[in-house]
């Protein structure tokens, strides 16, 4: 398990403890993974990101401490990469 003490604020950094990475979810269904992430770290929101999506949260390069991108494949919606905060 990977834990970090980071919370983004517009004026600086505050700390909290929460899970930041979910390698065990690679190969699972995206919706199941998103629900697990939301349950295990209430400070973040999981966003499903299929290939070639136009969803803004999936296409930006900004780092956000309250978002976890869940990259899924087109066939079956299976998680293809370790979901991490950012």
Curated annotation (Swiss-Prot):
pH dependence: Optimum pH is 8.0 at 37 degrees Celsius. Maintains over 90% of its inhibitory activity from pH 3 to 10.
Keyword 4Fe-4S applies: no
GO molecular function, one term: serine-type endopeptidase inhibitor activity
Residue numbers marked as site, Reactive bond: 61-62
Keywords recorded for this protein, A-Z: Antimicrobial, Disulfide bond, Fungicide, Plant defense, Protease inhibitor, Serine protease inhibitor
Thermal dependence: Active between 10 and 60 degrees Celsius. 84% activity retained when heated for 30 minutes at 80 degrees Celsius. Incubation at temperatures above 80 degrees Celsius rapidly decreases inhibitory activity.
Cystine pairings recorded for this chain: 8-65, 49-58
Top-level taxon of origin: Eukaryota
Family annotation (Pfam families): potato_inhibit
GO biological process: defense response to fungus; killing of cells of another organism; response to wounding
Family: Belongs to the protease inhibitor I13 (potato type I serine protease inhibitor) family.
Record's function text: Serine protease inhibitor which is active against trypsin. Displays strong antifungal activity against a number of phytopathogenic fungi including M.melonis, A.cucumerina, A.solani, C.glaeosporioides and P.capsici.
Protein name, UniProt field: Trypsin inhibitor
Organism: Fagopyrum tataricum
UniProt lineage: Eukaryota, Viridiplantae, Streptophyta, Embryophyta, Tracheophyta
């Amino acid at each position: 398990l990977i834990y970090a003490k980071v919370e983004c604020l517009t004026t600086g950094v505050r700390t909290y403890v929460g899970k930041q990475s979910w390698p065990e979810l690679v190969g699972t269904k995206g919706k199941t993974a998103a629900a697990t992430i939301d349950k295990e770290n209430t400070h973040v929101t999981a966003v499903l990101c299929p290939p070639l999506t136009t969803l803004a949260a999936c296409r930006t390069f900004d780092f956000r401490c309250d978002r976890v991108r869940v990259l899924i494949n087109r066939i079956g919606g299976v998680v293809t990469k370790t979901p991490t905060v950012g």
